[in-house]
């Protein structure tokens, strides 16, 4: 238990306000809708909703749920980014229930585990996700079927009952160290406090347009969705898949006059490298969170755009983010990045391992208290008791949440220093290595596995160290071991949890206390993986300065085994059948550091990941003269498929082929036209 000892030096308290939200988030939105019923609340492509239409649609969702959803149980939401998503989520809140966003593309076993923990009985779906959720034993409700005609007259119905602000608003599942995901339950009051703070802190007004591009399974989506609706502004949805392409994000910002948006720092870095980014002059505020913001990225932003850049911090166990810091306007003034000060009605403490406050400037673990806190973990009182601990009688809060983050308190605010445990962030995704290790160890060829985050070039990448099971040494160094391990994990964890690199060792090193030496394994991985990186080409200062090594390098060779890329020995790469295929194959070989690339092999099975696609995009342009969108690269993941796409062109909305350096706006229209044709 943290002890204050009357020492407030390691305590930060945000502005204390009298937040009055008796009807929770639905009440705040209803007040705005009453004042501006005809104003545009949300837009996605050519589809838009007025505030009145949103109220009517979400009311229909709420009434349906009140008839069929058990009281108190989370309602699963599996609807892609769209106006229907907004109506679905608001309808759940109006029904007095928490929403549980899920990714229907998650492995079925993981999805089933989440649903079993949640106890959900009803799912809001669209036509694509209906079969997936119905197959999980849930009662599906199609949201689009509840949408009324745009010009339908208002029908007088009994008003829905008010929803207390103490009600849970949502459940967000995150990685669990025991191998099982855990669901964080956030009350509506915590969400309202976070939104009202942001409205006031950044002077958000009805004229603002806020970009919604974060997947709804991440809590940052919360402010992107709800902040516009409590201020009378407009929520602009980036269509599904387009959030993966920085050029299309820039296109949307320009097209819609976006004024506020969010990036994880690694995506902001890629965004700033696109020439389109410099033309995003409508931006007023850009927010970063999800991982540490590098000084170089903040400086690059300040040199390119007039908007203000803000670094936010917060775990899933508190309402979205709980600290804020604004970067200096001039690039030359940015010499360190802080996470800053607490938001309204938030209390932060910095304590040593014995629960004593640390002096200013010393390192300690960050604790969070006050209004932003979650209620705990869904149906896991044991985990809740471990992470949410009582404060002593002298404290200004009743409960602290132990973040596991190391910080120190400076005059200008808190500085983030790392973790006290093994949790990592990879491309904005929070991952407990023990969850991946748990599933690795269930593979018959693996005796033990340790997963670490290693710095490879500019990125942090997930690396799995493998100790082979007895009698499996030869199998793990020959015959497609990496492919088997990837396939094994792909059935159990989300794609972002599957390591980019697999390395083998006869024994995994231990510390003097007998624990696995993760620090040493991280260092060894970084030494090996970065040793294979070539020097940057002349004139590529604005690009990623080096390519990543192949994901399948086994760098700690077993006895009598050679060190080599695993799958190259298993598959004989089919020879390119034409010049275009040959050029695409050469681009892949350059990015993946392979001598041979099977033309039907999947990019992600060969060690690729989402950010490596940006490198492939540039390499393909150098080799073929054609610049494909990142969205197309995600949907065409073999050499053969990409070569066909380059030869035939990307069908546009007018029937012509979009190839070469097509404007991002035209590429976006082509993608939307293709999606519409597939729906029709």
Indicate residue ranges for each PLM-predicted region:
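Acidic-histidine catalytic/liganding microenvironments
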Residues: 36, 117, 188, 201, ...
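AMP-binding/adenylate-forming domain of the ANL superfamily
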Residues: 1-172, 186-187, 193, 294-298, ...
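AMP-dependent adenylate-forming
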Residues: 1-14, 24-25, 63, 123-161, ...
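Short acidic/glycine-enriched loop/turn segments that link adjacent beta-strands
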Residues: 219, 317, 457-460, 636
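Amphipathic alpha-helical regulatory segments at dimerization interfaces
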Residues: 31, 117, 132, 300, ...
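Regions immediately C-terminal to embedded phosphopantetheine-bearing carrier domains
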Residues: 3, 160-162, 168, 511-513, ...
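Motif- and composition-driven signal specific to adenylation
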Residues: 84-90, 97-116, 155-360, 365-374, ...
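Short acidic/polar active-site loop segments enriched in Thr and Asp
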Residues: 73, 121, 259, 284, ...
């Amino acid at each position: 238990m943290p002890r204050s000892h009357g020492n407030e030096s390691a305590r930060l308290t945000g502005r204390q306000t009298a937040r009055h939200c008796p009807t929770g988030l639905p009440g705040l939105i209803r007040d705005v809708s009453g004042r501006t019923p005809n104003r545009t609340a949300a837009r996605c492509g050519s589809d838009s909703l007025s505030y009145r239409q949103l109220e009517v649609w979400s009311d229909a969702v709420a009434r349906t749920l009140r008839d069929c959803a058990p009281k108190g149980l989370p309602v699963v939401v599996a609807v892609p980014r769209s106006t229907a998503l907004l109506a679905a989520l608001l309808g759940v809140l109006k029904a007095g229930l928490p929403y549980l966003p899920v990714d229907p593309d998650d492995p079925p076993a993981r999805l089933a585990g989440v649903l079993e923990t949640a106890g959900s009985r009803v799912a809001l779906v669209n036509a694509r996700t209906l079969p997936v959720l119905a197959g999980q034993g849930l009662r599906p409700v199609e949201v689009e079927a509840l949408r009324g005609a745009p010009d339908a007259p208002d029908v007088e119905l009994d008003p829905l009952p008010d929803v207390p602000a103490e009600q849970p608003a949502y459940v967000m599942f995150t990685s669990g160290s025991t191998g099982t995901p855990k669901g964080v339950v956030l009350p509506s009051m915590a969400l309202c406090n976070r939104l009202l703070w942001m409205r006031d802190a950044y002077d958000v007004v009805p004229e603002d347009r806020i970009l919604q591009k974060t997947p709804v399974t991440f809590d940052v989506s919360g402010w992107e969705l709800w902040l516009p609706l409590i201020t009378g502004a407009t929520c602009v949805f980036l269509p599904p898949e387009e959030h993966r392409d920085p050029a299309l994000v820039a296109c949307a910002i320009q097209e819609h006059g976006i004024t506020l948006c969010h990036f994880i720092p690694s995506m902001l870095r890629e965004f700033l490298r696109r020439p389109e980014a410099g033309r995003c002059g409508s931006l007023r505020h850009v927010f970063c969170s999800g991982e540490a913001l590098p000084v170089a990225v903040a400086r690059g932003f300040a040199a390119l755009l007039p908007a203000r850049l803000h670094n936010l911090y917060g775990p899933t166990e508190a309402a979205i983010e709980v600290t804020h810091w604004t970067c200096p306007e001039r690039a030359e003034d940015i010499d360190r990045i802080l996470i800053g000060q607490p938001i309204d009605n938030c209390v932060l403490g910095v304590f040593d391992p014995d629960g004593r406050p640390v002096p200013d400037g010393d390192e300690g673990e960050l604790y969070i208290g006050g209004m932003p806190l979650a209620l705990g973990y869904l149906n896991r009182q044991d985990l809740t008791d471990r992470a949410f601990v009582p404060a002593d009688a002298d404290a200004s809060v009743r409960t602290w949440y132990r973040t596991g983050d190391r910080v120190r308190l400076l005059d200008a605010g808190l500085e983030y220093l790392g973790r006290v445990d093994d949790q990592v962030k990879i491309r904005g995704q929070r991952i407990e290595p023990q969850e991946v290790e748990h599933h690795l160890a269930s593979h018959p060829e693996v005796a033990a596995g340790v997963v670490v985050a290693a710095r490879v070039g500019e990125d942090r990448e997930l690396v799995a160290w493998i100790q082979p099971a007895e009698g499996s040494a030869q199998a793990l160094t020959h015959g497609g071991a990496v492919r088997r391990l990837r396939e094994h994990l792909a059935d159990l964890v989300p794609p972002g949890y599957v390591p980019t690199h697999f390395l083998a060792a006869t024994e995994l090193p231990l510390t003097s206390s007998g624990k696995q030496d993760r620090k040493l394994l991280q260092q060894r991985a970084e030494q090996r993986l970065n040793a294979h990186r070539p020097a940057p080409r002349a004139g590529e200062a604005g690009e990623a300065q080096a390519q990543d090594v192949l994901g399948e390098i086994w760098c700690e060779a077993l006895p009598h085994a050679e060190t080599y890329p695993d799958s190259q020995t298993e598959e004989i790469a089919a020879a390119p059948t034409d010049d275009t295929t040959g050029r695409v194959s050469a681009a892949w070989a350059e990015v993946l550091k392979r001598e041979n690339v099977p033309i039907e092999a999947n990019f992600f099975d060969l060690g690729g990941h989402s950010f490596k696609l940006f490198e492939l995009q540039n390499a393909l342009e150098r080799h073929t003269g054609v610049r494909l969108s990142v969205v197309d690269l995600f949907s065409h993941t073999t050499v053969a498929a990409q070569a066909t796409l380059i030869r035939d062109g990307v069908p546009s909305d007018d029937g012509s082929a979009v190839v070469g350096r097509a404007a991002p706006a035209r590429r976006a229209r082509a993608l939307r036209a293709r999606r519409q044709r597939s729906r029709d």
